């Protein structure tokens, strides 16, 4: 059967030992923009990978995830992978702010897109119920980025369907449940700006108790827990489904071993969102008005974080047909004072609600647009690191590692810190693999980047910040 045009297949050369079948792990990584299925061997090497866009259905009751399309793609891809290796585990890794309401048969309502605009009147009602920031470390966010608001809206708008729900499943656990039939809850998805969790106490929030949702959440399981075997697929009858994890937290897993989380350092996980997770940063620095929050890592510990929609904003600034720039393009924009001022996405970030704009001479070529996008994302990342009080080395993971200049510009903006680029472009995939091999820490391969020599960069940075805070 030919593969659909929306899927991208990436085969890898596979070495079979004579007389042996390769044992492998599958990581299902569902990001907001794309979904990816990766087959990895026992050493973490990629054997095969397939991707497809993660699309939102705008029709129906409300904008929602096309779960059936993803399910059909997943089943077809698993069948292909089963012919390449013996799959012993499947690990779901997904974006946050998403949950499924299910009964024993399946979804009772479509899974709401967190970028949906919800009624302001209802949001005002919800504001009276949500826990204080000091308890949840979850800021009030636009659209449906607070999962508690999504659930409140669904309960008020579709009470009959909501009443049928047996479980509320955060998104990684929905896919685990769909694969193996075992319902579970897990702290990394409960603890990412949901209003549902108290990170410092490790318990459900007052909102959950007020709404009487506690019985709907299945028992808590560790992200690495094997929930059960895959159902309904004889080729995968010996394959265990793991509980799964929130994608940004998957990128942090390698830093949780051997008490590494106690040493000051920052992981900048990049994709649709750029999320700075600062180990050792103080939680009392978090500003709920600036999209600062505490995510909860796989061990249940709060980690100070700040974020902006870096991948989304980069795409807007770089244009529909991005062309990688040269250092000369970046230097030219710095010299002429071309600035991109936040923000260029409608959801989240410290400057949400402000309209992005360009001041100074406009970029003229595709390469200059790419250069401006790179400068903007580096300046935003630098701003977030300062706000967090992030100390120690910085490691960039995810999609920005493909940008040949981003980390070098960031290093130039932060002369007191090492800025490294992970050689594993997908920290989420590595993190998913680690859950199946818990305790087997892969070698951390990262390249410390030399700061890009740019005349006038310090003045350019000061000018950018002066525009953001004109009275400062």
Predicted stretch roles:
Residues 82-115, 139-145, 172, 176-198, ...:
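Short beta-strand-loop/turn "lid" adjacent to the catalytic site in phosphate-handling enzymes
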Residues 116-131:
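Short alpha-helix plus adjacent loop in nuclease-associated cores
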